[in-house]
Amino acid sequence: MMSDYKPIDCGLYSEYEVAILHRSRLRLSWRDSSETVHIEVITPRDLRTRQGEEFLVVSGQDGRQQEIRLDHILHCKPA
């Protein structure tokens, strides 16, 4: 099955890497697989690639970890 993943800009990917290294909290908005939009302050933990798709691993304010597909992120700014 072909993925509908659309790679993000390398510069933006680098910004996520820097945020992970600096343990910077981010205010992130994204849509999930059911098209629900989420807005949350998160701490980025890691970047992962799986089956040609890239994900940001984050911890929410409640400590729960999740993976967010990079092309589903709508907006990101420092918290």
Describe these PLM feature segments.
Residues 1-33:
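Short glycine-rich, low-complexity segments
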Residues 29-31, 43, 59:
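Residue-level recognition of well-ordered beta-strand positions that form the cores
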Residues 34-38, 62-64:
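Short acidic/polar mixed-charge low-complexity motifs
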Residues 38-48:
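Short beta-strand-centered aromatic/proline hotspots
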Residues 52-57:
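Short aromatic-glycine-enriched beta-strand elements
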Residues 68-79:
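Structured surface patches comprising rigid loops and adjacent beta-strands/short helices at the edges
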